[in-house]
Amino acid sequence: MLAQLKKHLTLHELWEDAKFFFLLNLGLVATAVGIAVFKTPNHFAFGGTSGLSIVLATLFPRWNVGAFMWFINAALVVLGFAFLGIRSMGWTIYSSFALSFYVSLCERVCPLSAPLTSDAFLELCFAVILSAVGAAIVFNIGASTGGTDIVAMILNKYTSMPVGRALMVSDLGIVLVGAYLYGPATGLYCILGMILKSTVADSAIESINLRKVCTVVTSNPQPVSYTHLTLPTILRV
């Protein structure tokens, strides 16, 4: 049994698994920094579990954003187990709790009671870029950041409701509550952040997956065919 396991776990597969785990955590850390350093101090509640946690932390100041993310993500994971099963959840379970851990760690290492600067738009840009790029890294490797993605998976399995529309409605609801709590200016920043995040995330994913294609016209195709077959192997070495 052990010999068969060693046979299947080749060095290349171990490297791919290590790279996947590193990129997953890199994306989650970037997202967590965007939440803890830029979104939370400015009350940028533009959707998702982080936005809901920011609102709840304002209503119940005894708990911080990281604590509420733990509670919400734990509840969503339980829902995922009940409606989807453990196989369908996959890395979503890890991502949900790892993101909560990284946010709590950022709040412990760098506690902020006020924004870093007086420029709200500058902070919005960093909040959007870090969150969007982090999400793009995670989505590009076939994982997710957890949270409301679990709700999307449940809706996709049991209803005919378009997932994107359902999540947009829930995010808009969080934004409206944020606008009521923090004022119209913050509410408008939240709406802008919600729009920019999806745009930046799509652009980041396209940039990561960018490929160059060339067409070779030749009367001697054999050397070109040989190069086409051997070049990917050479690049992997």
Positions of the model-derived regions?
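Conserved small/polar residues in nucleotide/adenosyl-binding loops
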Residues: T227-T233
